[in-house]
A protein has these predicted regions:
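N-terminal nucleic-acid engagement/recognition segments and initiation subdomains in replication
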Residues: 1-125, 144, 377-380, 388, ...
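P-loop NTPase catalytic core of nucleic-acid-dependent motor ATPases
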Residues: 101-215, 369
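Conserved catalytic/switch belt of AAA+ P-loop NTPases
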Residues: 234-257
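Phosphate-sensing "switch" segment of ASCE/P-loop ATPases
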Residues: 257-264, 280-346, 353
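Positively charged interface segments
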Residues: 270, 276-277, 281-283, 294-296, ...
Length: 430
């Protein structure tokens, strides 16, 4: 680079050292004071900011190369500072830029959302988004409640974008449906810039690499949630989802610090018929499933949608958490997505669930074990299986007296050989 500008008007440095020699006063090489670096950046039209979404320092403007790495930008900046007689090492340049960036934080997500709020047309646009989701008719789910889950999750997304460390997400929206129906595409319909989100992420809360990676995005899709919800990760994941802050070491900082959580999660799962992805009913209030068969490619004014959500979140102060009544609805909904135990599968396969109700009988778990030739040692497991099925099937009533719990249970299936419609094999050629 041409060490130019030596003949231009001298800069009026804020901090200088004076040296008196032979009766004359003169300035020696300019010291690397923070004030001098800030002054030089202003003179060179170079902008330094800290991006709260990506967690990165941005160095732009002046004669710096565009789209270059921060390390390259620091090298170029130091060269320009040296050309203007600023005495500074590369380490000192890093320190100064980091300090200046910390004084100028910004969030591109927040800037976008403020603009959406400013230009909102005053109409509710949640229906426009909800219409993209074709609900699965085979799953018992209330349409209005599904829409409530979607809107409250969106409200949490904008609240966390502006989070100062006092807000926590309350749920992960989970789209349940077959592969190839556009579940991941739904995420990117929400984002004005695709690099604000990430998809197909498997999250292990105990992995520093996993948590560091997802912190750099606004909305993260947890692909194939069943893998993320592995049993050994469940407790850690429940705690992680609702954290208000994250431990993070900013670029080139010497120590880690607590920073506000600004990331929300959406999940996708390819749930097969008769399968589930939730491993137990306790603690599942953090998972908000909507079962769908397709994501439709209908028009959506994304900016107006976020303008409406901003209004709901900050003007109407609408909550992003579920009420007690809504939590009860969620428990009923989640019961349909439980991963079946061995005992549940046995009951579902062995009992005739299509039998008329007048053929059902009140039985204890012990009675059921006896009829199905199950060891009495498994009474408790069978009892829990009956309770889980009862949460999904209201016919399996669970009245109880002071001594035992009885269930209204269907009769056993007739063995195949006893079916009156079975065609006998003659053993002779037709």
């Amino acid at each position: 680079m041409n060490r130019a500008d030596n003949n231009t008007t001298p800069w009026n440095w804020p901090v200088v050292d004076l040296d008196i020699r032979h009766g004359q006063q003169r300035t020696i090489p300019i010291p690397s004071a923070l004030e001098n670096v800030e002054y030089a950046l202003n003179q060179l039209n170079i902008r330094v900011r800290y991006n709260q979404m990506t967690k990165e320092i941005e160095l732009t403007g002046g004669n710096l190369l565009t789209n270059a790495s921060l390390d390259v930008g620091i090298t170029q900046l130091r060269s320009q500072l040296t050309a203007h007689h600023l005495r500074i090492s590369k380490t000192e340049t890093w320190d100064a830029v980091s300090a200046i960036a910390a004084k100028h934080p910004y969030s591109p997500v927040c800037e976008y959302l403020r603009e959406c709020r400013k230009n909102w047309d005053g109409k509710a646009h949640i229906d426009d988004l909800f219409c993209l989701l074709k609900l699965d008719p085979k799953v018992q789910q209330n349409t209005d409640f599904c829409k409530t889950l979607l809107e409250k999750w969106l409200i949490s997304a904008v609240r966390l974008a502006f989070n100062k460390g006092d807000i926590a997400a309350q749920g992960v929206l989970i789209l349940v449906g077959p592969q190839g129906i556009g579940k991941t595409r739904f995420l990117y319909r929400l984002l004005p810039h695709s690099d604000w989100g990430a998809d197909g992420i498997t999250l292990d809360p105990g992995s520093r690499d996993d948590t560091m990676r997802i912190m750099r995005f606004w909305i993260v899709e947890l692909g194939e949630v069943g893998n993320t919800l592995r049993k050994e990760r469940m407790d850690a994941l429940k705690q992680y989802i609702t954290q208000k802050q994250d431990v993070f070491r900013k670029p080139y900082a010497r120590s880690a610090e607590m920073i506000p959580r600004r990331t929300v999660f959406i999940g996708t799962v390819n749930e097969l018929p008769g399968e589930g992805f939730l491993r137990d009913l306790t603690g599942n209030r953090r998972y908000w499933p909507i079962a769908i068969t397709q994501v439709l490619n209908l028009p959506l004014d994304r900016d107006q949608l976020w303008g409406y959500i901003m209004n709901r979140a900050f003007d109407c102060q609408a909550p992003h958490y579920l009420s007690v009544a809504e939590l009860a609805q969620l428990e009923s909904l989640n019961a349909q997505h439980l991963l079946l135990t061995t005992e549940e599968r046995l009951l579902l396969d062995s009992l005739n669930w299509n039998a008329p109700l007048d053929q059902w009988h009140r039985m204890t778990a012990t009675d059921v074990c006896g009829d199905l030739c199950i060891s009495p040692q498994n009474n408790r497991k069978v009892g829990r299986a009956l309770q889980n099925i009862a949460r999904r099937d209201s016919r399996l009533k669970t009245p109880s007296n002071h001594h035992q719990r009885e269930y209204l249970v269907p009769p056993m299936k007739a063995p195949a050989w006893a079916s009156p419609d079975r065609t006998e094999e003659s053993g002779t050629a037709p």
